[in-house]
């Protein structure tokens, strides 16, 4: 019986040794608390994302006969050709929604969506290959030429609908 008690005591000590004591208040604002390894420390205030980015609102209508989903980091300018919206206003922008989420557009539905500029180098390749280059504004980096008008022409030529 005493072996079992010692075993339990040893297990308890082992568990306690896995806990990390944060000690006094740290730069992250944590006070004295025992947090197990891999434990989560939640902030007192909600996390906000994209709070200082300019938002462009665009009215979108699905003219197709099937639902269309557009993901959070898809270049909205190059979204499905059956979506009708001001594509020029969406150039270089993505949906202002949480990462890994999407917005679904049902056939015939019209809705307004918030868009924000891409961060980083603002160089976009792939999607529907309408742009394949820099989409930012201002000084052109690394000799990349922004060709917004060419991308708009390509979109119209390939049957991408636009409200303007």
Swiss-Prot record:
It comes from Yersinia enterocolitica. Heterotrimer of UreA (gamma), UreB (beta) and UreC (alpha) subunits. Three heterotrimers associate to form the active enzyme. It is an enzyme of class 3 (hydrolase). Residues 1-30 are annotated as: Disordered. This is Urease subunit beta. HAMAP family: Urease_beta. Coiled coil: none annotated. Pathway: Nitrogen metabolism; urea degradation; CO(2) and NH(3) from urea (urease route): step 1/1. Keywords: Cytoplasm, Hydrolase, Virulence. Its EC number is 3.5.1.5. InterPro entries: Urease_beta-like (IPR002019), Urease_betasu_sf (IPR036461), Urease_subunit (IPR050069). GO terms for biological process: urea catabolic process. It is found in: Cytoplasm. It catalyses: urea + 2 H2O + H(+) = hydrogencarbonate + 2 NH4(+). Expression of the urease operon increases the likelihood of bacterial survival by contributing to acid resistance in vitro and in vivo in BALB/c mice. Y.enterocolitica enters the body via an oral path and must survive the acidic stomach before being able to colonize the intestinal mucosa.
